[in-house]
Amino acid sequence: MRWSEIGCTMKSVNIEWNVNLRQAFFCIARALDSVGVDDINHGHRVGYMAYSCAQAMEWSEEECQLVFALGLIHDCGVAQKRDFYRLLENMQPDNTQQHCVRGNELLSNCPPLAPFADAILYHHTPWDELKNIAISDRNKRFAALIFLADRVDYLKELYPRDEYGNVTQEARNQVCLEIGRLSGSLFERDLVRTMQHLLSKEFIWFSMEHHHIEAMGHNLPSTPFFEQKLGVEEIMSIAMLMANVVDAKSQFTFQHSQKVAELCQHLAKELGLNVEMQKALYLTGLVHDIGKLHTPEEILHKPGKLNESEYLCIQRHSTDSRYTLQMVFGQSVVCEWAGNHHERLDGSGYPRGLQGAAIDLPSRIIAIADVFQALTQARPYRGSMSLNEVMNIMRHEVSCGRLDSQVFDVIVRNSQQYYQLSIAESPTEWA
């Protein structure tokens, strides 16, 4: 079956392989901030303080912006709320190594960010240890500064705000005293002196609102790193990083995005779509659920039926995905396809209630891949399903006119291979 034989329109698609690196960092930061809901925008504040301190230290503009970006995503190894809460237990919490190692692995597997992976690995390492570790001077400085900014953000939350929500002068003084006490042991001395000077000014405290930080971040001068033109594989690696952050939020969705991506790619190939379309659908599969990071964990993990309000939270994730991806990928069709993955041919889907020819072939492919993969995975309210169970449910959806019959026929012809691909715990090669 070729796509030209399928009863839906296939408009000419111009796939733009561009990514806004600045927006990608903010996107990941916003996603991570959704994990620690009791300390929202932590990554924004750490990035901003690190950037401000680096500027005051007269680092190059490139390095200032890099440490800002790394500050935004420094906790990319934090998967769930419980991991985040451990970081709030004390000044030197136990078990920080796990999320540092995971963050290092995520960046190491993303070529554009791999040179900075060591800064994430050591961002909770005391200075009296870090100074003797054999990593680049740049990553050592980045790690030391991110650690300092991270702990300043932790310290300020130990003190009550005034009646208008401002950090009190007493709290500011105590923060400066505490980092000064740990200068030379936990923190690098020059960084501490510079940070203390910054914290003595009202400007830095008033600028810690996330909208101020994003406005500043979007208006920074051009630098080579952020203006570079990424290749397709590099863009894929950033999408994979985003997918890993999404999938780690719940043990029930582990590798879901990656598997949907693989299913999409195979379906596109068997339907005769060209290689560029196959890659674009793979990319869409990786990022289709990015909006789910705003969905509360208690809803994702609920073992029973969702009530009306909870279901509304679930429904909004595809819209959140669309707009989040537009900030990173611009007007790429990837954003539209990701936003359509819960649309159904009979108009019963969400969020726009599209039907029939209004749903293009790529959107139909990702809808089927998403349903198929979800059924093969365990969920809080059920175990994983057998191939027969999966196929029976999907046949019902097709017969009711919700999912595309001819795309589904591709799965029918190779159902065992698609099932094995979907349940495998690592990327699957399939000729």
UniProtKB/Swiss-Prot annotation:
**Catalytic residues, chain numbering:** 292 (proton donor)
Q: Which InterPro entries match?
A: HD/PDEase_dom (IPR003607), HD_domain (IPR006674), HD_GYP_dom (IPR037522), HDIG_dom (IPR006675)
Which cofactors are reported in the record for this sequence?
Ca(2+); Mg(2+)
One GO MF term attached to the UniProt entry: metal ion binding
Its domain of life reads Bacteria
Domain HD-GYP residue range list: 231-427
Which factors induce or repress this protein, as stated in its UniProt record?
Answer: Expression is up-regulated by 3'3'-cGAMP production (at both mRNA and protein levels). Transcripts are more abundant in biofilm cells than in planktonic cells.
What is the activity's pH dependence per the UniProt entry? Optimum pH is 8.5-10.5.
Catalytic activities: 3',3'-cGAMP + H2O = 5'-pApG-3' + H(+); 5'-pApG-3' + H2O = 5'-ApG-3' + phosphate
Q: What class of enzyme is it?
A: hydrolase
Query: What keywords are annotated for this sequence in UniProt?
Result: Calcium, Hydrolase, Magnesium, Metal-binding
Keyword Hydrolase on entry: yes
Residues recorded as binding a divalent metal cation 1, renumbered to this chain, are 288-289, 370
Give the co-factor note.
Answer: Requires a divalent metal cation for activity. Likely has a bi-nuclear metal center. Has the highest enzyme activity with Ca(2+), followed by Mg(2+).
For a divalent metal cation 2, which residues are the binding ones?
Answer: 289, 317, 341-342
Null mutant: what phenotype?
Significant increase in the ability to colonize the small intestine compared to the wild-type strain. No defect in biofilm formation. Enforced DncV expression in mutant cells lacking this gene causes an enhanced inhibition of chemotaxis. The double mutants lacking both VC_A0681 and VC_A0210 or both VC_A0681 and VC_A0931 show enhanced bacterial infectivity, and the triple one (VC_A0681, VC_A0210 and VC_A0931) has the highest infectivity, which demonstrates that V-cGAPs play non-redundant roles in cGAMP degradation.
Quaternary structure? Monomer.
Quote the function comment for this protein.
Answer: Phosphodiesterase (PDE) that catalyzes the hydrolysis of 3'3'-cyclic GMP-AMP (3'3'-cGAMP), leading to linear 5'-pApG. Also displays 5'-nucleotidase activity, further hydrolyzing 5'-pApG to 5'-ApG. Counteracts the function of the 3'3'-cGAMP synthase DncV, and is involved in the modulation of intracellular 3'3'-cGAMP levels. Enhances bacterial chemotaxis and inhibits intestinal colonization in vivo. Thus exerts a crucial role in regulating bacterial infectivity through catalyzing 3'3'-cGAMP degradation.
Q: Which NCBIfam families did the record assign? A: HDIG (TIGR00277)
**What is the protein's name according to its record?**
3'3'-cGAMP-specific phosphodiesterase 1
